[in-house]
């Protein structure tokens, strides 16, 4: 049994990384999106996939978007540990998005609309009547509005009325107007549960959908379902960053990066769309996004003068029209808006994604916060094509060997997946592949290769082994060695028991005391200032510190109209201690009791537990 366990431990690191899968398009198309009443009445006459009218969207007086989080009462109770992880990840993601996107802010309070098709049985359609296009009779069974299974509080909703007489101006009020949500431009309902979608695919960490849009087409509200099991997974201390990345990905979807919203994107001026519409199919059959800022970002990234270089959309799981809400993985691997997210340290909030959000017409983007994508940089307009990817290159590989992920933070294996159309790339190994995590230096694992794990270690293709190693042949694979920058694209490396050595980019070197070679990657190390992994000592700044005052993560006002329905999380007189803590305390006291019983026969132990939590300013619960 112990032998089999050892074999299992040895084999475990060689399985490729299991990545998070996004099912946004599947979810969004099942959601009925509610728009302002005038748009609801007209929706039956509009062909959704066409841009029926060109809109000019002024981009002045924009301020950082204020995203409010609402925790619904139907969300299952979480342990203190789970709740803390959830609030930290969601709060940090919201702060990051607020620092990236500015918007024309909602005046006064954000108030959502009711679905006229739910509360109204028929509408007066005679244009000669006083109450033309107003509701004439209510549905008897109308109860509430919902968003992806979450019941929207009446306080968040506008009122609704019926006009029983087509010529009588006085309506009958069905629901009064709610007070609305103050200081908010977008309302996100966060529901944590192990839903059927979560259980069906373990790679699904979360999913979202927008359910309300404003008069300009901008999303105003949506729901994010976070799979309960996601909060229980924790491989390393940086696992927090995985959750933050997932939440940012889903937030970008509900804020506008959605194929369902392409027809709502706004033009900035005359002749803005090079194809007369946002998307079109190129000569190879690839559907691309052809908006002006996206084209410029693509040209810059791939160093191309191609005047019509749109960003390709993912063809896997695309609709019949070829549209997708993700980038094509072969071309934009590592982007925050790829369909499959790898480890958080390898995901980039890239300039092309931010360009797309800019071209929605609803946001001004802080492009200075874009992160280096690296994948395909400078490789030309044909990079990532199926015809070219089957040859080994700086980004693609062939076969199934071991090597390094293209960012050189992780060891990898040459594999393909459902989004790569048969192309192969080096993906991180599932376990202990991170060179920058010191704990991955497992005793006995490739000691002869001179590996060093730590925050300044990176992955190098190598086949070195100590001269006294009995192994006759060492295959080329990824190894972890220390590095330090001496200039742009210039660095030294250090192998175990060696001095620092110059490693000229694009060459290979030998190491004294070892046989074999180390290959020095070109245009990867010491070139991008923002390519630094989280470390074991890194701590996320408190969600409640005023790191970005403009994100306005303020507490809901407690005026007389709102207070009965809003309360901040943890503002309660008693707090429950988590089950894990209780069990731990029980075990400790059981041991203590056993020891004391040697001296006493009877002992009564009473434990009082209490916990304190700082109020979460922007995370809100329904009473």
Curated annotation (Swiss-Prot):
Tissue: Expressed specifically in dorsal forerunner cells (DFCs) that form a ciliated Kupffer's vesicle later.
Transmembrane segments: 579-599
Membrane topology (Cytoplasmic): 600-623
Signal peptide positions (record): 1-20
Cofactor binding comment, as recorded: Binds 1 zinc ion per subunit.
Primary role: Plays an essential role for patterning the left-right axis. Requires solely on the left side, downstream of the leftward flow, but upstream of dand5, a nodal inhibitor involved in left-right patterning.
UniProt-recorded name of the protein: Ciliated left-right organizer metallopeptidase
């Amino acid at each position: 049994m112990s032998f089999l366990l050892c074999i299992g431990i040895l084999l475990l690191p060689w399985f490729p990384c299991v990545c998070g899968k996004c099912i946004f398009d599947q979810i969004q198309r099942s959601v009925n999106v509610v728009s302002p009443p005038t748009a609801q009445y007209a929706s039956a006459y509009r062909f959704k996939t066409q841009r029926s009218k060109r809109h000019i969207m002024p981009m002045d007086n924009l301020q950082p978007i204020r995203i409010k989080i609402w925790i619904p009462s139907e969300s299952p109770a979480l342990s203190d540990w789970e709740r803390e992880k959830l609030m930290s990840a969601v709060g940090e993601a919201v702060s990051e998005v607020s620092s990236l996107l500015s918007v024309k802010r909602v005046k006064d309070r954000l108030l959502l609309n009711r679905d006229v098709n739910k509360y109204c049985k028929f509408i007066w359609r005679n244009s000669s009547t006083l109450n033309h296009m107003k509701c004439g009779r209510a549905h008897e069974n109308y109860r509430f509005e919902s968003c992806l299974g979450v019941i929207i509080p009446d306080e968040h909703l506008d009122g609704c009325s019926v006009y029983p007489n087509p010529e009588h101006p006085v309506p009958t009020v069905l629901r009064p107007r709610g007070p609305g949500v103050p200081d908010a431009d977008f309302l996100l309902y966060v529901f944590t549960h192990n839903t059927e979608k979560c259980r069906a695919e373990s790679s699904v960490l979360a999913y979202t959908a927008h359910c309300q849009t404003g008069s300009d087409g901008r999303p105003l509200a949506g729901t994010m379902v976070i799979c309960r099991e996601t909060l229980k997974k924790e491989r390393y201390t940086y696992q927090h960053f995985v959750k933050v990345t997932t939440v940012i990905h889903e937030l970008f979807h509900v804020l506008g990066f959605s194929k369902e919203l392409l027809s709502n994107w706004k033009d900035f001026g005359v002749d803005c769309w090079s194809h007369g519409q946002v998307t079109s199919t190129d000569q190879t059959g690839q559907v691309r996004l052809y908006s002006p800022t996206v084209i410029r970002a693509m040209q810059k990234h791939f160093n191309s003068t191609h005047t019509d270089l749109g960003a390709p959309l993912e063809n896997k799981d695309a609709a019949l029209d070829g549209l997708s809400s993700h980038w094509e993985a072969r071309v934009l691997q590592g982007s925050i808006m790829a369909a499959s997210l790898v480890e958080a340290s390898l995901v980039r909030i890239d300039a092309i994604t931010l360009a797309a959000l800019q071209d929605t017409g609803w946001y001004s983007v802080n492009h200075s916060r874009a992160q280096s994508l690296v994948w395909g940089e400078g490789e030309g307009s044909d990079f990532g094509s199926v015809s070219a990817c089957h040859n080994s290159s700086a980004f693609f590989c062939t076969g199934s060997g071991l090597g390094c992920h293209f960012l050189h933070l992780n060891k990898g294996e040459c594999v393909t997946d459902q989004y790569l159309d048969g192309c192969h790339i080096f993906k991180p190994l599932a376990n202990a592949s991170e060179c920058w995590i010191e704990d991955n230096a497992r005793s006995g694992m490739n000691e002869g290769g001179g590996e060093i794990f730590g925050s300044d270690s990176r992955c190098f293709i190598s086949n070195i082994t100590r001269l006294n190693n009995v192994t006759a042949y060492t295959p080329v694979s990824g190894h972890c060695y220390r590095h330090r920058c001496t200039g742009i694209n210039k660095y030294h490396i250090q192998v175990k028991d060696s001095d620092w050595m110059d490693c000229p980019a694009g060459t290979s070197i030998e190491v004294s005391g070892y046989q074999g070679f180390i290959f020095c990657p070109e245009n990867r190390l010491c070139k991008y200032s923002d390519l630094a992994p989280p470390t074991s000592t890194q701590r996320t700044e408190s969600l409640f510190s005023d790191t970005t005052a403009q994100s306005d993560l303020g507490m809901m006002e407690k005026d007389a109209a709102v207070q009965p329905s809003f309360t901040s999380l943890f503002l309660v007189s008693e707090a429950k201690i988590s089950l894990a803590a209780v069990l731990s305390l029980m075990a400790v006291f059981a041991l203590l009791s056993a020891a004391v019983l040697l001296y006493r026969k009877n002992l009564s132990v009473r434990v009082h537990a209490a916990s304190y939590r700082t109020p979460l300013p922007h995370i809100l619960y329904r009473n």
